[in-house]
Amino acid sequence: MPFAIATYFERTKGEEITMDKPEKAATIFQEGYNCAQAVIGAFALDCGIDEVTAKKMAAAFGGGIARTGETCGAVTGAMMAIGLRYGQTCGSDSERKEKTYEQVHEFLQRFQARNGLLRCKELLGCDVSTPEGRQQAKDGDYHNTRCPKFVRDSAEILESLLEEGRLRDSQN
């Protein structure tokens, strides 16, 4: 099965459906999870953890880190996946540390090239750390009109980076 395809169990019907990672991330987001949970949840199994643990790990990162409007949760979710995939397991493993940072930098560059920005409040055009900003986001239906694009973009970029890494690893 290609890396881009995942089997996902629809919670309400219990039936098996096949979708790519960006679609899976968007589906998780539409189920009510935050943007970070959606991205890491879609890639959890590929990164060596179960989806429930991934979603719990990312629970505080929505809305730009606990709704502070800082780094977009779709971005931090991808960064967590990169860390799980490449991160060091020994403090002295500087090679894996550098590989992780290299992959994060590449991800950030690609996300910024698509969207211009990395901060939630700038991407949305409102400050979700304030009641007024949250109301603006609600009134504008940003959860359905803006955020899904960032979740999909993040998942597409992450999928591409992980696939490129798999190809390089298989050539060595």
Question: For each predicted feature, which ranges?
Answer:
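Short, Lys/Arg-enriched N-terminal segments with co-localized hydrophobic residues
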Residues: 2-18
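Glycine/serine-rich anion-binding loops at beta->alpha junctions
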Residues: 61-80
